[in-house]
């Protein structure tokens, strides 16, 4: 391929990737692959400037506007950032800055992996919020942004200002959202960034409010009245904006690199995703002096973390059944080290995912961790796929191969039909109960609809006992599986008939654990009814929906007799949930189960929110480091019970930091700011 053809191919590919990323929010390649192609194109264009195309992505910032949203023309150009991937490349950028500026100073900020947006305020009131789009024209998403709780609708000062920032979905909210989507049979989002982008493009503002987006603001797009970037960020905090406290003042490359190394270590601790560090010249007058290229400011650069991937082989695919009947494929792989953990299994999501990527048994694949948490298959290495050796199926051929190779014929991949036997076999029957699987038109999932499917019953029991439902401590998946296999428990009502003697028949269950479980089961009878409702596992009814339903009807019995119209009147709940609830309680099985649970002494009443005026009432508290006695969620719940507002980052507004072992930058920053420090034991002593 000649140079001109290669430039054309790279340009077309990158423009398509940019469209998928910026406009559709459905990227088909990893950032690292895009960056590799982009830098190859830059190199080719530098060597052959006469061949640069007018639509080259090196001249613009990508994206077009979907017809479904009103276009918004930005009064200021919203530039993207240039990026570097090594200390050497960063040093070259810093050297260029020093050629223009004497003794420059820098501000280093975390690069949030979210969706860029701009907020327009007039006389202190939010009038417009828009996506960045292509840098000149974006989408008006004002009503959706108003549903983000940390975006101030009115500033502390009555000023006109345009600010830029990033909308993101915290990891905890992302996990909750995907869990809800899985229960509803919807495809999970690939990562928090895609989820944030998809949320801001929702036409139903109630969905936006429910998902819990957050923001960090980082730049004034309108002419700034401050002298430095550091002052801009402090001013933003005074106005009421959320500003990321994880930032550092630096005077040279070494200090910049120290922050990058700290950010790399901090990455897994953060409650949100980051994909790098942004370095900016601190002085705004010097920023103006340095100016811009066609695409990016010369006074700022983004250092991007390398995407960690690993190559492995898919050995086989298992199909498992969840409590709602969704049948999910999981790849068994040759164990490989990825992001400091050994990975041997990865989700394949659904049939569509397998077929779109053409995933087959014994394929070599690249895997990565979505959000650095969930192992996923990213790319099939087709060039390493071993083709099957097809032989004409004859008796003579069979006899020859068996005589010549014996059992090794299997190892050599010799097959005697046109069927490609490495393709993943899509099940037509449930792997647990052999019932026919259903593929509904509005779903991507295969589903077992047999209410007596053992796997579904087992998973429903596990869900019922889980922390967010009835919170029966000690009654985990292993114990429940044994109880189910021994037929000691066949539905959730049976749990309340268990005795210590029953539990002692199980493997690895001793007297102490058995007593603990029986006590926890008894205690769960007194839970507020929304916990019980969530534990029943009604499709589309998550924890928040369960609470809203019980707030309205006050009692589980009353809810079980409600109509779809009555339920649909509840704000934030729609017809889908109303239909699901009514349909569930109309079944004979549900009516019988309610009677059994009531006879077992379970509370059916909504007990209401517990308002605790504790010693930490109104205080902002940050947890950091490794806790040895409490789980992090337990510590958070205890702090909230004492009246505290638990935050994920240290700032001037922080009142207290609870520091466990190996506490890092948050503890250091708290000490620098003179914030009170507690140990885990101090918290336990309360």
UniProtKB/Swiss-Prot annotation:
Q: What Pfam families does the entry give?
A: BRCT (PF00533), DNA_ligase_aden (PF01653), DNA_ligase_OB (PF03120), DNA_ligase_ZBD (PF03119), HHH_2 (PF12826), HHH_5 (PF14520), Nlig-Ia (PF22745)
Entry keywords, A to Z: DNA damage, DNA repair, DNA replication, Ligase, Magnesium, Manganese, Metal-binding, NAD, Zinc
Q: Per its UniProt record, what InterPro entries does this chain match?
A: BRCT_dom, BRCT_dom_sf, DisA/LigA_HHH, DNA_ligase, DNA_ligase_AS, DNA_ligase_CS, DNAligase_adenylation, DNAligase_N
Give the intrachain disulfide bonds. Answer: none
Q: Give the binding site residues for NAD(+).
A: 31-35, 80-81, 109, 132, 166, 280, 304
**Catalytic reaction list:** NAD(+) + (deoxyribonucleotide)n-3'-hydroxyl + 5'-phospho-(deoxyribonucleotide)m = (deoxyribonucleotide)n+m + AMP + beta-nicotinamide D-nucleotide
Q: Where is the active site?
A: 111
Q: Which cofactor does it need?
A: Mg(2+); Mn(2+)
Residues annotated to bind Zn(2+): 430, 433, 448, 453
Q: Name one GO biological process term.
A: DNA repair
E.C. numbers? 6.5.1.2
Output the SMART domains linked to this UniProt entry.
BRCT, LIGANc
GO molecular function terms here?
A: DNA ligase (NAD+) activity; metal ion binding
Q: Which domain of life is it from?
A: Bacteria
Q: Does the keyword DNA damage apply?
A: yes
Q: Which PROSITE patterns match?
A: BRCT, DNA_LIGASE_N1, DNA_LIGASE_N2
Q: Which GO terms describe its cellular component?
A: cytosol
Query: Which residues belong to any copy of the BRCT domain?
Result: 611-686
Q: What role does this protein play? A: DNA ligase that catalyzes the formation of phosphodiester linkages between 5'-phosphoryl and 3'-hydroxyl groups in double-stranded DNA using NAD as a coenzyme and as the energy source for the reaction. It is essential for DNA replication and repair of damaged DNA.
UniProt xrefs under HAMAP family: DNA_ligase_A
Task: Return the similarity comment.
Answer: Belongs to the NAD-dependent DNA ligase family. LigA subfamily.
Protein's UniProt name: DNA ligase
Q: What organism is the protein native to? A: Lactococcus lactis subsp. cremoris (strain SK11)
GN (gene name): ligA
